[in-house]
UniProtKB/Swiss-Prot annotation:
Pfam families the UniProt entry points to: TFIIB, Zn_Ribbon_TF
Top-level division of the source organism's lineage: Archaea
Organism: Caldivirga maquilingensis (strain ATCC 700844 / DSM 13496 / JCM 10307 / IC-167)
GO CC terms of this entry: transcription preinitiation complex
Sequence repeat residue intervals: 152-235, 246-327
Protein name: Transcription initiation factor IIB
Alphabetized InterPro entries for the sequence: Cyclin-like_dom (IPR013763), Cyclin-like_sf (IPR036915), TFIIB (IPR000812), TFIIB_arc (IPR023484), TFIIB_CS (IPR023486), TFIIB_cyclin (IPR013150), Znf_TFIIB (IPR013137)
Length: 336
C-alpha cells in the first residue's frame, strides 16, 4: 500500500516538473491563473479538464478552480516579509538592492565614470584613457562584443517603444540562443535583435507590430520579418497566434480613453471570435475597429484616423474592419 502511494506521489511530482518546464503563465486575474505552452494550447486539469487555476499563496499551492486538484505545491514566496503602504515606507524597509538583470552586460562590474565636474582637462583625458582600457579588458571575445552591441540596441528600441522589462529580458534570452546557434553571422545585429524583441513581446502577451518596431531601427521591415521567420524556424519556437484583445489596452492608453472602452472593445472582439470573424485578419486592425465601435457606443468618440495612428494601421483597415464587425454582429451605432 505504501509502495503504491509512494509511486503515485512520484508520478505527481514528475507531472508537476513537466508542467513547469513546458507551460508558462498566460493570464492572471486576481488569484485566477491560466497557462499555455509554446503552441498556444492551454494547460488543463488532469482530473476535470478545467483550464483555470487558483494561486493559494498562504499554502504555496496552485490548485484547479473547479475540482481542487493540487497542480503545484511548495511554491516559494520571493516577496518581502514586511508590508509597506507608501513608496517612502517601501524604500525605508527594503534591505536589498535590485536583482541581477539579463538586459545588462555590466553585472557586478565597477565602471569608471567620465562625467567629471572638474575643469581640469588633463584629468579628464586621463580618465577617458582608463575608461577605454577598461572596455577593452572587459569585452574580449567576439561573442561578448556582439552581445554588448545587441544589448545597447535592444535598450534603445525598447525605450522608444515603452515595452516592459520582462519583454526585454525575454528578447535577450532569445538573442543569446540565436548567437550560440550561429544565426547572426552575415546578418544585421539590428535586424536580429528587433526580430527577437517582436517575438518576446508576443510571448509575453504584449505584442508590438513589425511596422511599429521598424520605426525605431535602421533595419528595414522586410529584413526584420525575414530574421523573425528564420529564428522561429531554426530554434523551433512555436508562438501562440496573436490575440486582437492584447492590442486593445495599448490603443486605449494612447488615446487616453476610459477603462470601460477597453472592456466594451474586448467584448466585441470575443463575440466576433465566437462567430469566426477574426480568422485570417490582422489582429491590430481588428482591435482598432473594436475600439472605434466601443468609443461610438460609449460616447467617447475618436476619429478613425486617431485610432489608426494609435494602432499603427491604416485608416482603410480600420474602416473595413469596422464595417464588417458592425454588419456581422448587428451592432446599432447611435447617430449624433
Amino acid at each position: 500500500m505504501s509502495t503504491t502511494q509512494g509511486g503515485s506521489n512520484q508520478q505527481d511530482e514528475t507531472r508537476r516538473e513537466l508542467i513547469i518546464q513546458k507551460f508558462k503563465l498566460f493570464r492572471r486575474e486576481g488569484n485566477n491563473l491560466e497557462f499555455v505552452d509554446q503552441s498556444g494550447q492551454k494547460l488543463r486539469c488532469p482530473i476535470c479538464g478545467n483550464t483555470v487555476f487558483i494561486e493559494d499563496a498562504e499554502r504555496g499551492q496552485i490548485v484547479c478552480a473547479s475540482c481542487g486538484y493540487v497542480l503545484m505545491e511548495h511554491i516559494l514566496d520571493t516577496g518581502p516579509e514586511w508590508r509597506a503602504f507608501t513608496p517612502e515606507e517601501k524604500e525605508d524597509r527594503a534591505r536589498t538592492g535590485g536583482p541581477l538583470e539579463r538586459v545588462t552586460s555590466e553585472e557586478l562590474v565597477t565602471r569608471i565614470e567620465t562625467t567629471l565636474k572638474s575643469p581640469d582637462l588633463k584629468k579628464k583625458l586621463e580618465i577617458l584613457k582608463y575608461k577605454k582600457w577598461q572596455q577593452r579588458i572587459r569585452v574580449q571575445t567576439s561573442y561578448e562584443r556582439n552581445l554588448v552591441q545587441a544589448t545597447h540596441e535592444l535598450n534603445r528600441i525598447a525605450h522608444q517603444l515603452g515595452v516592459p522589462k520582462s519583454c526585454m529580458d525575454e528578447a535577450l534570452a532569445v538573442y543569446k540562443q540565436v548567437l550560440k546557434s550561429g544565426l547572426v553571422k552575415g546578418r544585421s545585429v539590428e535586424a536580429i535583435i528587433a526580430a527577437c524583441l517582436h517575438m518576446a513581446c508576443r510571448m509575453q502577451g504584449m505584442p508590438r507590430s513589425l511596422d511599429e518596431i521598424s520605426q525605431y531601427t535602421r533595419a528595414p521591415r522586410k529584413e526584420i520579418a525575414r530574421c523573425f521567420r528564420l529564428i522561429a524556424r531554426e530554434l523551433r519556437i512555436r508562438l501562440p497566434l496573436s490575440d486582437p484583445r492584447q492590442y486593445v489596452p495599448k490603443i486605449v492608453e494612447q488615446l487616453k480613453l476610459p477603462g470601460d472602452i477597453a472592456k466594451e472593445a474586448i467584448r466585441v472582439l470575443e463575440e466576433a471570435k465566437d462567430k469566426g470573424l477574426t480568422a485570417g485578419k490582422d489582429p491590430a486592425g481588428l482591435a482598432a475597429a473594436a475600439v472605434y465601435i466601443a468609443s461610438l457606443l460609449k460616447g467617447e468618440v475618436r476619429t478613425q484616423k486617431e485610432i489608426a495612428q494609435a494602432a499603427q494601421v491604416t485608416e482603410v483597415t480600420v474602416r473595413n474592419r469596422y464595417k464588417e464587425l458592425a454588419k456581422e454582429l448587428n451592432i446599432k451605432i447611435p447617430i449624433k
